[in-house]
């Protein structure tokens, strides 16, 4: 019998948060309190300006360090899932450094164009509020060079996730990815983070 190998492997991890409904309102309240201080302000200096990010609020990069019971609870849960994910890809660690974390609040037509997260073996996105659109994020397949139309049957050039509130997606930070223009009529809310294992 022929054996299938997958030497070029790009891992994605997904998990739904079983206690999400218990903390959902708290998370949204905390995020919106920060958002309302400076609505749709983007932190930092981005040379591409509106070509990179548009119609969204991006918080400072220490959101998960806020000492609130709901944030502490989701931080602990995300941390354990990161540890488990690192172990699955043969990076043994008992502790993970979430070196940066932030939220996005995005209004209709807002987007975050293609980018990657340097020095981040695993990044993560946690979906909170869909804003009445189930379009999540898009990633570009790093394996390029298709020369025939049949290859797309088993190896897509892109992957787009569904925005399901309470879902965590963990992925290699070096993958090019984006948040496509928001098509919902309400605000889209999510968390993002960068991590490194402590070995």
What annotation goes with each model-predicted range?
Residues 1-91, 111:
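Non-heme Fe(II)/2-oxoglutarate
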Residues 4, 178-180:
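Karyopherin-beta/Importin-beta family HEAT-repeat alpha-solenoid scaffold
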Residues 82-102, 106, 124:
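Hydrophobic, well-structured mid-protein blocks that either form specific transmembrane helices
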Residues 100-170, 180, 187, 197:
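Catalytic core of non-heme Fe(II) oxygenases with the double-stranded beta-helix
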